């Protein structure tokens, strides 16, 4: 037999009403959680039982959801009522103008202007404000100077490191150059010794052609002498 349809009206029996509330509340919380997860929705649910007990669920922060709801409601009201939106912006403009005037007035007072009606207490408060401003300015200046000094020290350390690396490379290149010169000088000395030894070696006789050239030279000299 099929389940009968429940009439949507207040349940008179207190026990049945509490049981139904517990079941429906659990299902509602489950659906809200599923909606937030499946649809990536920002969900906030608040339920008060007939006894005043609070039950709630929020996918993120309940406070942020409520604030967002209130802002959306105000925006919706402004869209529905253009005159209300115009008044809102008029109030904003008036507030901003007043803030600008106050800033100009305070600035003139800090410069020593418009203080003719000041009492001793007012002047003391203004002096304290100026001293606090100067203290903040000095602290900011000291902070910036310290940061600049730190940057310069870091750059100096980097330059020293680069110079050290260049000095090492120069020493290596200089040492290699010295070794290369030694090898070249050693090779030249060996070649000179070989040439000298070859010219002084008696074991190496002249070729017949060289002997003939020498004889011809001697004959030519004798002919010159006879003439």
Curated annotation (Swiss-Prot):
Annotated SUPFAM superfamilies: SRF-like (SSF55455)
Listed Pfam families: K-box, SRF-TF
The keyword RNA-binding is assigned to this record: no
Biased composition (Basic and acidic residues): 198-227
Biological processes, Gene Ontology terms: positive regulation of transcription by RNA polymerase II; regulation of transcription by RNA polymerase II
UniProt KW keywords: DNA-binding, Nucleus, Transcription, Transcription regulation
PROSITE patterns: K_BOX, MADS_BOX_1, MADS_BOX_2
Gene Ontology molecular function: any one: DNA-binding transcription factor activity, RNA polymerase II-specific
InterPro entries xref list: MADS-box/MEF2_TF (IPR050142), MEF2-like_N (IPR033896), TF_Kbox (IPR002487), TF_MADSbox (IPR002100), TF_MADSbox_sf (IPR036879)
Domain of life from the UniProt record: Eukaryota
Tissue-level expression: Expressed in seedling roots.
Annotated Gene Ontology cellular component terms: nucleus
Compositionally biased tracts (Polar residues): 186-197
Positions of disulphide bridges: none
Subcellular location(s) per record: Nucleus
Keyword DNA-binding in record: yes
Sequence segments annotated as region (Disordered): 183-227
The MADS-box domain, residue ranges: 1-61
Occurrences of domain K-box (ranges): 86-176
Protein purpose: Probable transcription factor.
PANTHER family found in the cross-reference section: SERUM RESPONSE FACTOR HOMOLOG
Name of this protein: MADS-box transcription factor 25
């Amino acid at each position: 037999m099929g389940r009968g349809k429940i009439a949507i009206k207040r349940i008179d029996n207190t026990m049945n009403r509490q049981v139904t509330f517990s079941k429906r509340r659990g299902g509602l919380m489950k659906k809200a959680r599923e909606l937030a997860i499946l649809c990536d929705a920002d969900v906030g649910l608040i339920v008060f039982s007939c006894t005043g007990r609070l039950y709630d669920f929020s996918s993120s922060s309940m406070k942020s959801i409520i604030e967002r709801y209130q802002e959306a409601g105000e925006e919706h009201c402004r869209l529905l009522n253009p005159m209300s939106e115009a008044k809102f912006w008029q109030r904003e403009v008036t507030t901003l103008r007043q803030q600008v005037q106050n800033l100009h007035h305070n600035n003139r007072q800090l410069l020593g202007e418009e203080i003719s009606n000041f009492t001793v207490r007012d002047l003391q408060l203004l002096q304290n404000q100026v001293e606090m401003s100067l203290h903040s300015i000095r602290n900011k200046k000291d902070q910036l100077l310290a940061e600049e000094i730190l940057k310069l020290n870091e750059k100096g350390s980097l330059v020293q490191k680069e110079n050290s690396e260049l000095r090492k490379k120069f020493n290596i290149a200089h040492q290699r150059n010295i070794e290369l010169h030694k090898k070249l000088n050693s090779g030249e000395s060996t070649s000179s010794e070989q040439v000298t030894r070859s010219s002084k070696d008696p074991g190496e006789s002249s070729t017949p052609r060289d002997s003939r050239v020498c004889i011809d030279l001697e004959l030519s000299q004798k002919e010159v002498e006879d003439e």
